[in-house]
Amino acid sequence: MVVIRLARGGSKKRPFYNIVAAPARIRRDGRFLERVGFYNPVAAGGEEPLRVAFDRIDHWVSHGAQLSPTVARLVKDAKAKVAPAA
């Protein structure tokens, strides 16, 4: 099974997460199939805190991928921000 989840990067006390589609049995920061976005919880100034490729998320979900609870929340919030602008 494929899971869309966060893979941690960054340095100590400065987390940065890649949103990746990865097999469920692979470790958190291990091999992945595709990077579909990123999340920067400590974004400062003009830095972009979240970027999600909705078309790729939809592609993986249509092929049976599951969203982790945190990624599901982030995607829901990102879609809510995009919808009023359209």
Curated annotation (Swiss-Prot):
GO MF: structural constituent of ribosome
Keywords: Ribonucleoprotein, Ribosomal protein
Matching Pfam families: Ribosomal_S16
GO cellular component: cytoplasm; small ribosomal subunit
BP GO annotations: translation
Superkingdom field: Bacteria
PANTHER family registered for this protein in UniProt: 30S RIBOSOMAL PROTEIN S16, SMALL RIBOSOMAL SUBUNIT PROTEIN BS16M
Stated family: Belongs to the bacterial ribosomal protein bS16 family.
Protein name as annotated: Small ribosomal subunit protein bS16
Source species: Methylibium petroleiphilum (strain ATCC BAA-1232 / LMG 22953 / PM1)
